[in-house]
Curated annotation (Swiss-Prot):
The keyword Transmembrane applies. This is Tetra-spanning protein 1. Its main location: Golgi. It is found in: Golgi apparatus membrane; Endoplasmic reticulum membrane; Nucleus membrane. Residues 260-279 are annotated as: Disordered. The lineage of its organism: Eukaryota, Fungi, Dikarya, Ascomycota, Taphrinomycotina. Belongs to the PER33/POM33 family. Interacts with RTN1 and YOP1. GO terms for biological process: cell division; endoplasmic reticulum tubular network membrane organization; endoplasmic reticulum tubular network organization; membrane organization; mitotic spindle pole body insertion into the nuclear envelope; mitotic spindle pole body localization; nuclear membrane organization. One of its GO terms (cellular component) is endoplasmic reticulum membrane.
Length: 279
């Protein structure tokens, strides 16, 4: 008796359910983040000017992607007011996805700053890679007897998996360094009138949460702080800058030492490569 051959659905029937899923909207948001960030950087870095809509587009893509993750995570709590307690709000405050969602909202409103897009773009490369490997490739190239197709899909999947595994930790270190750099960019931007002090304060709150959740951020802040101490110690630095730096450092140190709760029940972090669950 001949083995029964597996019936493979047409490509449209395989892909259409994927496109209709909210995961695909999340994926589309990540693609918008990556493409818009790259296009903005390609113009802003060499020419020091780029269309603001590219920056806003990247921020919008991030808002869409993180909004879906937050809805998937917290929608059961939203339907029951009994769950709106201090533990729920502490969980919200410590959730990386909430922090990046709020930061993206502020980026949509505020003046563009080039490097503020970089962490979102780096995260997007891993999110896109994981989604392609776990969702899109299996839909486009199902496990059929066509050796060439299976081999091609397998090679692409292996490359994506290898990229995720080998580059994840270095990428998180880079993200932490960029986010720490942005803190000092905003600090000096207040003196140069390139950004408001309210934006700096808001970002300090964001980085305070990152300091709690990420050992990469803690290591980065410590390293950059030591470098800044050496730079400010130079006799050529005006006393007003030295005093401002020491005051700022003291304030941030006290703020960073204040308790913000525990991260025991925190949901999946934004830096995770896991896509939101399907519906």
């Amino acid at each position: 008796m001949e083995p029964k051959q597996r019936v493979v659905k047409p490509l449209k029937e395989r892909v259409l359910p994927v496109v209709k899923n909210t995961q695909f909207v999340w994926f589309s948001g990540q693609v918008i983040v990556l493409i818009s960030s790259v296009l903005y950087a390609l113009q802003a870095i060499p020419f020091r000017s780029a269309p603001p809509f590219l920056f806003k587009s990247a921020a919008f893509g991030a808002i869409v992607a993180y909004a879906i993750v937050l809805y998937k995570t917290y929608s059961p709590n939203l339907t029951s007011r009994a769950s709106w307690n201090k533990h729920f709000f502490a969980r919200l405050m410590l959730d990386d996805n909430v922090q990046y969602f709020i930061l993206a909202l502020s980026m949509l409103i505020d003046r563009p700053i080039l490097f503020s897009l970089a962490p979102y773009a780096i995260y997007a490369t891993f999110h896109i890679s994981t989604y392609l490997r776990s969702v899109l490739l299996p839909a486009i190239y199902p496990n059929i007897s066509d050796a060439k197709t299976a081999s091609y899909a397998s090679r692409v999947s292996n490359l994506l998996n290898q990229y995720t595994r080998s580059q994840f930790q270095p990428a998180m270190q880079l993200v932490a360094s960029l986010e720490t750099f942005l803190l000092f960019r905003l600090f000096f931007g207040v003196f140069l009138r390139k950004n408001s002090i309210s934006r700096l304060v808001g970002y300090i709150f964001f980085l305070r949460m990152r300091y709690t959740n990420s050992h990469f951020t803690r290591a980065s802040i410590k390293a950059v702080s030591l470098r800044m101490d050496r730079l400010v110690a130079d006799n050529r630095v005006p006393p007003v800058i030295k005093n401002a730096w020491h005051t700022f450092k003291t304030y941030v140190s006290k703020f960073g030492a204040s308790p913000v709760g525990t991260a025991q029940s925190r949901p999946t972090a934004s830096s995770s490569t896991t896509a939101p669950s399907s519906t």
